Amino acid sequence: MAVQQKIRIKLKSYDHSLVDKWALKIIDVVKQTEAIIFGPIPLPTKTHVYTVNRSPHVDKKSREQFAFSSHKRLIEIINPTARTIDMLMKLELPSGVDVEIKS
């Protein structure tokens, strides 16, 4: 039985539509190379909440909360070819999307 190679691509962004759009573009590129692909798998969304005082001096009870969510998607590519890797390297992702690649 042959050992399968895997590439895992994790996409992170504060805008869920941007993550979904670029996940589909990556999938389209990989499908052209006939590699096996799983995804996009939505990972749990993390919400970060920051609480700050409204006033710099008094009124400790008067506070304001700011929240933002980070959305993540996972794409797994099985048995990638050299052409698959070349096409993935040529993709130019926008600055709002963070990409993490593990093999």
UniProtKB/Swiss-Prot annotation:
One GO cellular component term: ribosome
Cystine residue pairs: none
GO molecular function: structural constituent of ribosome; tRNA binding
Gene Ontology biological process terms in this record: translation
Alphabetic keyword roster: Ribonucleoprotein, Ribosomal protein
Role description: Involved in the binding of tRNA to the ribosomes.
Family: Belongs to the universal ribosomal protein uS10 family.
Protein name: Small ribosomal subunit protein uS10
Organism: Chlorobaculum tepidum (strain ATCC 49652 / DSM 12025 / NBRC 103806 / TLS)
